[in-house]
């Protein structure tokens, strides 16, 4: 394999044994593909597929007026261009969206003509609001903030069969039910009650007998019985009664008479139970009629009405039980044939028959009325209303839709072969569902498992947006229908009919405030990627936290390779929010699929198939780690496999599929934990969650021990700058990279220049710092997909969330008790865990009732010192170092007129109006904050004059744009002239500036000319003349194009900003705050080993080894055994080896050894100790040297999950680095110099600093704001509140008998209003006495009691 630009510079030693059959797919595909399908941008009318927006329009249009004389048809839509790009949207606080224009056709029919002749057709494009666009990283910019729409895992539409697990009835009897769930529309439930009758519920309302629904569908009692039951036919001949025998039906019954064959031989004696052997004998004997006594009929149910043969009178209705009286009537009427229902207690219960018996309705109309009463209680039913209501419930495409998925699941579940069909239900569907339910109750078939991933599907962004859009369109439809009747008479255009507000509102509401539209977690690249790959069971149409039981939250066998069993939040959402597995994707129906390799006759092929949970059940699937021989055949006698969702072993020839990779089980975050296989699952869960909280450090440091996934995450997350096309680096500085594209990648007629502007010191959603640093130098050759610049938490294109620290596992004076962490001062000095946080502070000047607020440096009652960081416009300058209380933006607000004294009136009259009628409302730095101003943005309303600061910012931005465009033009021009030079040199000229005819053109001659004069050359070859003309035209076109581009950007910058009503001006100030690590900060490793920094010790006091190297961190060894996350110990050992090898390479470089020696040593590291071999021969000597230089800090290792380094390989690495194979060494106490008595585990562990910083939590209060009713201090840091002295704390003081302290706590330090003001005054006067009064909460209590009508008085003694 060829190495990319960055891989060459630092190759990771890979310990994996298994081959890469399949690359890790693009990690954001689930978001991007879904939304791309929804928009279908760029598709022509013919190319539109029936999904997304197009499908939503088609489902609502055409809209036909109530009279039917006018119709509005949908033709197609197109998306416009966004007004601002992504960065401008974030800056201005607007939504990144495009206008949607829909072409509709208004058709008016001729009223007079009988065959609806068309009278008039009008076509027009109608604006239907803005549709938010997805950025290339799968996020949306809504009102200037980056948001993610999380995918939802919901119950698939279709039919489900279930039982209540015996919980409903006290007897513990299983009550079975069936539920038809549509994509939209009413739910239909069938359920058994304890008496075994079947009931139906519509939309979970009160239940009706199921036969009511069947009657409403038009079935008669007889048809219903025929559909569900077979019949026994009895013939009456005089005094004998013969049964038409179906021997199978007798099984399990007790013979009430002797059963004989044709010859009179007794096959079954009276009183014996009939078995399968007896039935075989009966079938052999060919007995077709069986004589039975008349009382055999008693208690049986009639299947067909019994009619008097002579008179035609009905003797007994069908579904009536035969009694002695009835039999007498039948005998009297000389009926010759009776049909009864065949039922038994084992596999054919009388459920439907019993249900019909409790059903009070007798015909279709009564049934419809009954359903109408249930759906609309209290309304008087009419025949039409009842029919319409029932028809609309399940049989109208407007109100009911199973969707393609629902129809597929429905048909598969009830055993049909075809998977396509109508979206509405049919009579047959309902009958089939009932049949299946009755079969399950009879013991044939099983109930469904609703947690099976074949019954849960993923709804992605596109689908949810489409549903919202349809909701908006349906609202529009109602309004349009009413207006269409006017369209005929008033000659309206389509534009006048459609009001786009409801559509825009529905979309806005979905993206702005839906439960699944979330503020993006932007702590670091991993948290971004994980957020976009999250799958939630919550949200509209999903579960709620309170209702979700254990089963839903649990890991299911079908999660394998689809949903990660490890990564899920701790707390109330556990198991409801999951993460997609690394290789998982959704299929066209929205079910999750996992990839497998095909195995044929125990030979593993490279063919890959994606299977959903349903399709995989019948396969026998081997693990990715199954042993193969050289030919790729399974060799073990028994292979560990998964079959029918169980783990078992099978012979190799039975295996049909094999896993693609061992990491296909886990999610991206879990696959970044090295030695995951040695960690307990609970700790791995914490490890994968805490990696998402790591704050990007000042200097990213790649993990010495990684898993090989780091590069994929960094590349796919979009925080790095990735080359769009290959080429040569033309110029590079801190803020941009310019690439001159290689000739073979340049499309004709475009500039072969790619300019990448880097993001510098920008605030993320979590207030961390986003900053990109270029990796390339001028003249470097890069290919498409190479990484040009690192983003936050990335190091040379690899994810780098923390720092490699030298750790020792030993107790240290109790400073690392209970997971505390003891740090060395060196960590702070080297800024290893220093992070930059950027805060955005906003000052808004509004128009108030008393006049406009003003942003100015002229603030009343403020000293000169407070204003020295402001410019003349009253805004702080960039680069100022500010602390709590400093003014950032000066602002004054007019205050209401107060009654003036005569003296003040006089002063006013003399010195003019404006002296004292304003108050200071400046923006100040909040408490506990100290930092540097790094940027200021000023937004001014249209029509309000811009201040000097706004103008200078605008000028700066214009200069930057101009510089970019000039650079682009310079390169285009340069490239064009280079191509011309290649063509012209050596060719003969006809004439030109200072040139004779027939002279050959040389390089020197061209160098002497100005570039503009080249086009005055006349060449002998006409093709060259044509090339010169084309080049001249091309260059002038480019110039024009770039000028237009500049003017467009300039117009955007100079137009006023769209601010909220009543706002005149907004100033945003960005503060950069540097936070060093300090006691109280939370740190963690990647194995769920978290702790709080307890102390920072001087370097000289830390334990050190025999060479005098001190450790950076001392961790408590007791944190390992009980937590069972041994992975951290293995990581420490391998980290030690990696660092040792780096030091060895460093010594070789310092001793200036030959390249061949270096190459040999690198070969030993990469290719002689297990794992994947690296092809070092393809690197030249200079590249080997560059690689060695980058390895001096340590050789990075990759130990992929479930396929990582073995113990012997770690030992071999330690040996190669000349370190003890135990990974332990003797340490000395830094304070005394004495050796500790036992060897200590020392090595390198990757530590993260989490976003739980003590600076954000530290808080103290003396006096402050009080709650209105109780007059007690508020709580919490945000309210500048106090600490609550609660019930238990009061008990503690009571227990000590500290009466005065307790009184102080409950009165003057809490809610005794007079007491506390008096106390404050006393302290100011130096008198430290207190007088406790009445606590306000006692007064509240008395008022509460009085409000109950109890008079209560306080008596004073």
UniProtKB/Swiss-Prot annotation:
Its EC number is 2.7.7.6. Keywords: DNA-directed RNA polymerase, Nucleotidyltransferase, Transcription, Transferase. One of its GO terms (molecular function) is DNA-directed RNA polymerase activity. GO terms for biological process: DNA-templated transcription. It is an enzyme of class 2 (transferase). One of its GO terms (cellular component) is DNA-directed RNA polymerase complex. The RNAP catalytic core consists of 2 alpha, 1 beta, 1 beta' and 1 omega subunit. When a sigma factor is associated with the core the holoenzyme is formed, which can initiate transcription. Belongs to the RNA polymerase beta chain family. NCBIfam families: PRK00405.1, rpoB. This is DNA-directed RNA polymerase subunit beta. The gene is rpoB.
